[in-house]
Structures are given as structure tokens and as C-alpha cells.
A protein has these predicted regions:
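PLP-dependent amino-acid enzyme catalytic core
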Residues: 1-256
Length: 256
């Protein structure tokens, strides 16, 4: 991670402030009692479109908007798509979002509500939608916005950690969701540059833990993915994603 990464994150937080919400950092009495420690929750469920994905999407789209692109292409299993559609509507940008045919109807309707055009791919998986989206973008010379395999997106997701440290710098460990690795590589990278002894613990759904298994194996592999309630952090990884090496460098422990 670039030694000035924390500065880029702070700049991103200022850049996207008009497009996101500052979410609460809330003490949890019940989890604190259960664990015998002080537990705080960063409530990104109160974020615009209901997910931290709003941060990375806003940062990348604001950067792309400087070149006034005719259209921007992305792929998603749902939450990233909603985030991109919302930010694009705010910025007056046209986006085309590739989604797997298995996307939940609620997430599909939410994306359409923001006015984005969608393409449902025949394949089931998120990475298949990503492959189709990348191919379409390259064929038509449009910019492609990855849900996680992009440093500007990662920097945007890391603004979550920047907000946390504005409220509380006294903690020993942080537990972060690890799907494609964009959130945890960004937050982990920022926190480790600010608090050298913080422990970063990755949390993945047992039924779909691609990055967890990749870190264990030392390489990205094709694994079986089963249904999970945590569909927002599920799915396979794009081979060659920058988040693999970033996650290896910042994750201290990984659990499912």
C-alpha cells in the first residue's frame, strides 16, 4: 500500500461528502457483554443505498466525471449496482450495469429506480457479469468500473475507517467484511497507517469465502459457492484482482 494512502483517503472523504452520509459509530451493549469487551458498530446500513458501496462508487464516478464519459459500464450482484446508479443520477452520468440473472428482485428494482440501464447476464455468478461487462466496455471504448478491483473504489471504501477514527482511536481490533476485498483492503490499509498495532480481522460467509480461501492457498482459486444470507459479500473473485495482494498485506486473521 502506498505510504501516502491515508492522505488519499482523507482527500476522498472531502471529495464525496456531498454524495454520502456520515454514518453513526454506535456502542453495542449486548455485544460488549457477550464478548467481555467494548464493541462499537459502524452502521453503514444507514448509508445512502444501504451499503458502504456508496463510498467507492461515489469516489470513482467523481473522478471519471472529469473526463465527461459518454457512458460508464459496471457489474454487480446488487449493492454496488445500487450505489453506482444512485451516484450516477446525482452526477448526471449514464451507466449500464451488468447483473447476474440471479440478482434479487428487490435489488434489481432498486437499481432501476435510480434510472440506470441494466443487462441481466445468463450466467449465475458475479464474476460472469464482470467478464461480460468488461468485454462490452472494451469493445465500445467505455470506462469500466469494477466493484472492488480498482484503487479509486478501494480508496472510497476506506473513508469508512477515516470516519471511525474521527470518533474513536482507542481500539485493539477491527472486524471487517471480506467479499471481493475492496472494503477490508481499504479500511485495513488506512487503519494500519494510522494505528500501527491494530489487528484487522476478516469476516467471510462460510458458504462463499473466495478471498478467505485465496489467502489460505496463496493464490486465487475457483471454489464452490453456496447460497448465503450475506449475499452482499458473496461471489467469486476476478483473477488478477489487486485486492488479493492488498488483503494479504493487511489482514491479520481471517474467519468464516
Amino acid at each position: 500500500m502506498d505510504s501516502n494512502f491515508h492522505k488519499h483517503v482523507d482527500e476522498a472523504l472531502s471529495r464525496i461528502s456531498s454524495l454520502i452520509r456520515k454514518t453513526p459509530l454506535q456502542y453495542s451493549p449486548s455485544l460488549s457483554v457477550k464478548t467481555g469487551s467494548e464493541v462499537y458498530l459502524k452502521l453503514e446500513n444507514f448509508q445512502v443505498t444501504g451499503s458502504f458501496k456508496a463510498r467507492g462508487a461515489a469516489n470513482k464516478l467523481m473522478i471519471l466525471s472529469q473526463d465527461k464519459p459518454e457512458r460508464i459500464i459496471t457489474a454487480s450482484s446488487g449493492n454496488h449496482g445500487s450505489a453506482v446508479a444512485n451516484a450516477a443520477a446525482e452526477l448526471g452520468l449514464e451507466v449500464l450495469i451488468f447483473l447476474p440473472k440471479t440478482v434479487s428482485p428487490a435489488k434489481l428494482n432498486k437499481i432501476k429506480l435510480f434510472g440506470a440501464e441494466v443487462v441481466l447476464t445468463e450466467a449465475d455468478g458475479r464474476t460472469d457479469a464482470e467478464t461480460a461487462a468488461r468485454a462490452y466496455a472494451e469493445e465500445n471504448n467505455f470506462p469500466y468500473l469494477s466493484p472492488y478491483n480498482d484503487l479509486d473504489v478501494i480508496t472510497g471504501q476506506a473513508t469508512t475507517a477515516a470516519e471511525v477514527l474521527k470518533e474513536n482511536k482507542n481500539f485493539d481490533a477491527v472486524f471487517i467484511a471480506m467479499g471481493g476485498g475492496g472494503l477490508i483492503s481499504g479500511m485495513g490499509g488506512y487503519l494500519k497507517q494510522k494505528i500501527s498495532d491494530v489487528s484487522v480481522i476478516a469476516c467471510s460467509p462460510e458458504n462463499s469465502a473466495a478471498m478467505h480461501h485465496a489467502i489460505e492457498a496463496g493464490r486465487i482459486e475457483t471454489i464452490e459457492h453456496l447460497d448465503t444470507l450475506s449475499d452482499g459479500t458473496a461471489g467469486a473473485l476476478e483473477f488478477g484482482t489487486i485486492t488479493f495482494e492488498l488483503c494479504k498485506s493487511v489482514v491479520d486473521h481471517s474467519i468464516t
